[in-house]
């Protein structure tokens, strides 16, 4: 008999709506003992079967659901089915947009909670973010090897969130050859270098693909400021869109060096690209004091908020940085501003931009809305999967 997690009375509603998480406060008791990440059955207070999931005794998310089908076992065949389902959608996207790189598995939204897999050419980059994902590592890798025999697998599970579930950080090759120091990929006509081993996340922010393309329609003959530029995806796209100048700002010299290489790789005019190593907040204030002006500003900061206790501080940070950006824009200029914080709702982010405009003494029109690219889908039963939001704002 399998280990069972019994829910408290009345706490089964979210599972009946097929939400994939069980929080610790919803648990009445455990029947049997389960190790970290082990597969358990989840039942209501009367013992009625609801789901099968992974157990995490130290996490606020006490269980993450693998399946709502009682007949489905969690084994290699299960992961093979999930991979096949996910690949069908990515095949269509890759053909439509001419992609050789995309998010193959987007966690809960692809029915694999705690698992992120990005494909860069013939490299699969894996992040196992939950105890259940780690427990199923061998089965998942076996399924990947069967489905993608041409691909090498590299582990980038060096993510702090693993510590919350009692796991160590891991990184390194799993199967196949080691990724090159910089791997070229293609995106909407751009060639971009990706640092799989040492870059942010899995090496590159695939979720901003559509936003980078959208930037081109605003930048012709314009002066562009690209804040938190990382390896210059927005800068390359702006140059391809015909900008007069693009200034890329980041604290990492290594990222800026790759950004410069990306401009050169695409045979674009390097004299139109400036790379500045600096703190964005400080530099924006310095630009304001010097009365510098731009026509387009891209504001794509890292996540400011990891948990609810940080939300108020994050709101202040987002407001301050967007206020400074608005002050630097010429009349009729465009601010492309983003938040990748899952706890920051689209409505709250829009209100923050509105408040920033008031503090800047400028009127702002919202003219376009952005979200993560379509290879980062959001399943209807898990709205938390929508984490990236953005706006194009015309500043009067």
Swiss-Prot record:
Residues 2-79 form the PUA domain. It comes from Citrobacter koseri (strain ATCC BAA-895 / CDC 4225-83 / SGSC4696). Disulfide bonds: none annotated. The keyword RNA-binding applies. It is found in: Cytoplasm. PANTHER family: RIBOSOMAL RNA LARGE SUBUNIT METHYLTRANSFERASE (PTHR42873), S-ADENOSYLMETHIONINE-DEPENDENT METHYLTRANSFERASE DOMAIN-CONTAINING PROTEIN (PTHR42873:SF1). Belongs to the methyltransferase superfamily. RlmI family. It catalyses: cytidine(1962) in 23S rRNA + S-adenosyl-L-methionine = 5-methylcytidine(1962) in 23S rRNA + S-adenosyl-L-homocysteine + H(+). Specifically methylates the cytosine at position 1962 (m5C1962) of 23S rRNA. Its EC number is 2.1.1.191. InterPro entries: PUA, PUA-like_sf, PUA_sf, RLMI, RlmI-like_PUA, SAM-dep_methyl-trfase, SAM-dependent_MTases_sf. GO terms for molecular function: RNA binding; rRNA (cytosine) methyltransferase activity. NCBIfam families: PRK15128.1. This is Ribosomal RNA large subunit methyltransferase I. GO terms for cellular component: cytoplasm. Pfam families: Methyltrans_SAM (PF10672), PUA_3 (PF17785). Keywords: Cytoplasm, Methyltransferase, RNA-binding, rRNA processing, S-adenosyl-L-methionine, Transferase.
């Amino acid at each position: 008999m399998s280990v069972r997690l019994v829910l408290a009375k009345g706490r089964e509603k979210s599972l009946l709506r097929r939400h994939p998480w069980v929080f610790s406060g919803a648990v009445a008791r455990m029947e049997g003992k389960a190790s970290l990440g082990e597969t358990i059955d989840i039942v209501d207070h009367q013992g009625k079967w609801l789901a099968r999931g992974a157990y995490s005794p130290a996490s606020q998310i006490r269980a993450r659901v693998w399946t709502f089908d009682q007949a489905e076992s969690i084994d290699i065949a299960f992961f093979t089915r999930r991979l096949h389902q996910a690949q069908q959608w990515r095949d269509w996207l890759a053909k439509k947009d001419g992609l050789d790189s995309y998010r193959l598995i987007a966690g809960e939204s692809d029915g694999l909670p705690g698992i992120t897999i990005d494909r860069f050419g013939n490299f699969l980059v894996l992040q196992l973010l939950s105890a259940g994902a780690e427990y199923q590592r061998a089965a998942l890798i076996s399924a990947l090897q069967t489905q993608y025999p041409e691909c090498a697998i590299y582990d980038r599970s060096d993510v702090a969130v693993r510590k919350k579930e009692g796991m160590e950080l891991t990184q390194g090759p799993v199967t196949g050859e080691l990724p090159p120091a910089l791997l070229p990929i293609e995106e909407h006509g751009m060639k971009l270098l990706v640092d799989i081993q040492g870059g942010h996340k899995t090496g590159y922010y695939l979720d901003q693909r559509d936003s980078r393309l959208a930037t081109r329609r605003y930048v012709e003959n314009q002066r562009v400021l690209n804040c938190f530029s990382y390896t210059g995806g927005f800068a390359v796209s702006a140059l391809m869109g015909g900008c007069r100048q693009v200034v890329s700002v980041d604290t990492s010299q290594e990222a800026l060096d790759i950004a410069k290489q990306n401009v050169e790789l695409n045979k674009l005019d390097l004299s139109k690209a400036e790379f500045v190593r600096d703190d964005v907040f400080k530099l924006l204030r310095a630009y304001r004091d010097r009365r510098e002006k731009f026509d387009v500003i891209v504001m794509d900061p890292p996540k400011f908020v990891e948990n609810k206790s940080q939300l108020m501080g994050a709101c202040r940070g987002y407001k301050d940085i967007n206020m400074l950006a608005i002050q630097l824009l010429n009349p009729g200029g465009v601010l492309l501003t983003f938040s990748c914080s899952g706890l920051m709702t689209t409505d709250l982010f829009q209100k923050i931009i509105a408040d920033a405009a008031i503090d800047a003494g400028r009127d702002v029109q919202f003219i376009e809305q952005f979200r993560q690219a379509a290879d980062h889908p959001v399943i209807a039963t898990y709205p938390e999967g929508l984490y990236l939001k953005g706006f194009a704002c015309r500043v009067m």
